[in-house]
Amino acid sequence: MSKTYAEINDRIKKGEVVVVTAEEIIDIVDEKGVKKAAQEVDVVTTGTFSPMCSSGAFLNFGHAKPRIKVQKAWLNGVNAYAGLAAVDLYVGATELPEDDPLNKVFPGEFKYGGGHIIEDLVSGKDIRLKAIAYGTDCYPGKELDTWIKLEDLNEAVLTNPRNAYQNYNCAVNLSDKTIYTYMGTIKPKLGNATYCSAAQLSPLMNDPEYKTIGIGTRIFLGGGVGYVIWQGTQHNPTVARTEGGVPKGGAGTLSVIGDLKQMVPDWLRGVSFRGYGATLAVGIGIP
């Protein structure tokens, strides 16, 4: 049974829409069959909430007096990329403070990084902004040391060049020593297995051939509203697939964007991976 977006939106307005998760629909189909389930259910929601290093935020903090064209900048000691316009910055989820000991004492703890900056912003915390510049006629300022909050910024935009990986890896360790990776700590001699997939809830596993999700799709992002803007980096739809079209390895990805000011720390969390680095866990939901 097919339903149009207009029909479903009309049921939403009337308060009659039936929404279930991709996990719940499995039991409904088992009990009632595909046809009956399609008749009764209007929307099936998918989602994922996991660390994604390919994350960051564009920030515009407005002009100071005197005006400054930022050359280098730091947020709570974490480097922010300033190679944009005068007071535009980009903070990447994996960026670290310049004084972080890193892996000099192995394994490093990586207690604070760009992902934590983003979480602190959406938590309403004050962030120390330090910036330097070489000075120009139109931007004479050479130094800035101030405190900012998310509500003070002109714009704050969360960007994920890659997220919602379709059928990602499982990691095991066959060696005799513990290894520290972006998949977490992996114990020797098959002592554990770590994976990163939302399984039956995974957005692109429920749309394996990308027939529903695409450019312009409106999504839940970090607790707010976001949009799919392009295929994600490392998008590879040509991997081997099952007869049903499900990829046998890592395949599709999504590039997404959203207004950071709408988001909440419940769905944006700074993460520290021992021996590897810092990142950001991002909550995504796609109907």
Give residue ranges: language-model regions:
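Anaerobic metallocofactor- and corrinoid-dependent redox/one-carbon enzyme cores
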Residues: 2-287
